[in-house]
Curated annotation (Swiss-Prot):
It is found in: Cell inner membrane. The gene is mscL. One of its GO terms (cellular component) is plasma membrane. This is Large-conductance mechanosensitive channel. Homopentamer. Belongs to the MscL family. GO terms for molecular function: mechanosensitive monoatomic ion channel activity.
Length: 138
C-alpha cells in the first residue's frame, strides 16, 4: 500500500474529518466570542465603572529610556481574555449539557423486545401441543 493511499484513508476517516471540522468551527467561534466580549460586553461594563477602557489598564514595570520601550504588564487585556474564556466555557457547557440530555432521551427509549430464538419457538410449540393433548375431547 502506498504512503499516499494510507494517508488518504487516514485523513478521510470519520473521526479525523469530524475533528478538523470541530477545530475550524471552534476557531471561528473563538473569534466571534472575542468580538462579542471586546465590542459588546466590555464597553457598557467600562461605562458602568466610569468610562474605563479595559484594554488600557496596564502597569508600567520600567519606564521607556531613549530608544528602549517601556516594559508594561497589560492586565486589562488579560481581564478581557478571562471574559472570553468564561463565555466560551459557558457555551461549551451548555452544548455538552444539551448533548447529554438528548443522549439520555435516546437511552431511555424502550428497546424492542428481542425476537424469540429458535429454541424458544420450539418450546412454545411443544407447550401448545401438550396443552391440546390434555384438553378433554368433546
Amino acid at each position: 500500500m502506498s504512503m499516499m493511499k494510507e494517508f488518504r484513508e487516514f485523513a478521510m476517516r470519520g473521526n479525523v474529518v469530524d475533528l478538523a471540522v470541530g477545530v475550524i468551527i471552534g476557531a471561528a467561534f473563538g473569534k466571534i466570542v472575542s468580538s462579542f466580549v471586546a465590542d459588546i460586553i466590555m464597553p457598557p461594563l467600562g461605562l458602568l465603572i466610569g468610562g474605563v477602557d479595559f484594554k488600557q489598564f496596564h502597569l508600567v514595570l520600567r519606564e521607556a529610556q531613549g530608544a528602549v520601550p517601556a516594559v508594561v504588564m497589560n492586565y486589562g487585556s488579560f481581564i478581557q481574555t478571562i471574559f472570553d474564556f468564561v463565555i466560551v466555557a459557558f457555551a461549551i457547557f451548555l452544548a455538552i449539557k444539551l448533548m447529554n440530555k438528548v443522549r439520555r432521551k435516546q437511552e431511555e427509549a424502550p428497546a424492542a423486545p428481542p425476537a424469540p430464538t429458535a429454541e424458544e419457538k420450539l418450546l412454545t410449540e411443544i407447550r401448545d401441543l401438550l396443552s391440546q393433548q390434555q384438553q378433554p375431547k368433546l
